[in-house]
Amino acid sequence: MSKLLCAVLLLAASVAASAQGARRKVILDQDSVGPGGSNMLSMLLALQSPDVEVLGITVESGDGWQDEDVAHALRMLELVGRTDVPVYRGSTYPLVNSMESMERWEGMYGKIPYKGAWMKEWLENSTQEPRRYHAPDVVPPMKEGEPKIKAAEGTAAEFLVREARKYPGEITIMAMGPLTNVALAVRLDDAFAANVKDLYWMGASLNPMPPKRDEYALEYLFSPRMNFNVRWDPEAAKIAMHAGFKKIVIVPTDATTETRFTPEMLETLKRSSSLAAKYAAKYPSVGMPLWDELTVAVWLDPKLIANSETMSMDFNTDSGSAGYGETLTWRPGKGPGLGEPVVEAVRTVHVEEFDKVFLAGLMR
């Protein structure tokens, strides 16, 4: 038995033994293209945690279009036996940004390496499996099979507002895609942000230093402040940041650069009888960073954070500028004073400990 597997099993046992008291309430907001990959495995970490109550999953477009993202989320829940968790349809399009405006921007300032649902050309020999571009209302054939269950009635924004009112001060919004659904909830209810306990978001980019100049470094080599979850809908990011959340924790690209889904992880997952581990092993994402998984993990176990920094943060929404969608930061109190929030940005994590938490969660 490998040292990694032994450590994982011990961690899983200790977590199960310590799961007592009130369960932490969370809503997962995802652009859940699948099967497998960071979007799905991150949700599984929360779903598998014995001290977490996942109230629901809200879905928007981003990595994929909303219709296909919803289908993949529903099918994942079927495969891991969690059809008790409702899935709500959210935004199909960004608030202002569009494929046409993005293409005009590229004509002036150069190509954006990754464009999610708008991708028409992929890098050769990419670790990511290229997906053929299609219209928003098309759901391509699904490797994992089509879901039998349906999305819940109502919109994602309505669900977010309703649950925040029902459990004031208790709910974490775990956002791992663009912030369109969150922004719509903010606009729907002025008290939404005040009713939420905290907002965790995998988004923004400060100055990521990838371990090598691989395909995931290309996006940040010349544009270190651009992150896809912001660039898809910069206006939504600004609205969410300015909404008045009591606590905002950002997991930017920087913190994720040392993480990877490794071949050893895959072999470990293959030996597990857990439905979540079986799903992850059947649809592996070997070689890819664990972006969203890390965001859930530092919420589950803040001790994984090696270094974080408090800063004021905002986003460039000047669509005609070269910096449209880029992250803007200042030392607290040194910004322009236009309502930019103070956030906690995770800079580095204890990678080996995170790997154990990641595997233990899926194998539980």
Language model: regions and residue ranges:
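Bacterial N-terminal signal peptides that target proteins for export
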Residues: 1-6
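Hydrophobic h-region of N-terminal signal peptides that target proteins for export
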Residues: 9-18
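Active-site histidine-anchored catalytic micro-motif
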Residues: 21-83, 100, 120, 125-249, ...
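Conformational coupling and interaction surfaces
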Residues: 22-24, 41-54, 221-222, 228-364
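A short acidic, often aromatic-flanked loop/helix-cap motif at beta-alpha or helix-coil junctions
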Residues: 93-97, 256-258
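Extended, histidine- and acidic-residue-enriched regions that form the cofactor-binding/catalytic faces
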Residues: 100-107, 283
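A charged helix-plus-loop insertion that forms the helical arch/lid used to bind
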Residues: 104-124
